[in-house]
Each structure stands twice: as structure tokens, then as C-alpha cells.
From Swiss-Prot:
Name of the featured protein: SRY-related protein AMA3
A molecular function (GO) term: DNA-binding transcription activator activity, RNA polymerase II-specific
SUPFAM superfamilies reported for this sequence: HMG-box
Domain of life, per lineage: Eukaryota
Organism expressing this protein natively: Alligator mississippiensis
Gene3D superfamilies, per the entry: High mobility group box domain
Presence of the UniProt keyword DNA-binding in the record: yes
UniProt keyword annotations, A-Z: DNA-binding, Nucleus
This protein's record includes keyword Zinc: no
Major subcellular site: nucleus
Intracellular or extracellular location(s): Nucleus
Recorded coiled-coil stretches: none
Pfam family, one: HMG_box
Length: 54
């Protein structure tokens, strides 16, 4: 979406992607949810003392 609309603000891209995400079925969302869990576990293993500090 960002490549197709290079001048679109990030907030608008996020809003549109969120709307598209809500339209997906659980089966369509599952691969993304599983990958997020896998990456989270990998990050926790590689960086056990990591603390988010904005």
C-alpha cells in the first residue's frame, strides 16, 4: 500500500490496513498470528533482558 501511495501518511495507511485486517477470517489471519508468536519467542530467547524503552 505504501509503495502504491508514496505520499500517503503512515496514519492513513495504518487505518486502511486495520480495516482490511478486520475483514479477514480467522483462517486468513492465522499465519500472521503464528508468525508473530514465533518471532516474539525468538526475540525473547535472543534478548532475554530486553526492555522496551520508548
Amino acid at each position: 500500500m505504501a509503495l502504491e501511495n508514496p505520499k500517503m501518511h503512515n496514519s492513513e495507511i495504518s487505518k486502511r490496513l486495520g480495516a482490511e485486517w478486520k475483514l479477514l477470517s480467522e483462517a486468513e489471519k492465522r499465519p500472521f498470528i503464528d508468525e508473530a508468536k514465533r518471532l516474539r519467542a525468538m526475540h525473547m530467547k535472543e534478548y532475554p533482558d530486553y526492555k522496551y524503552r520508548p
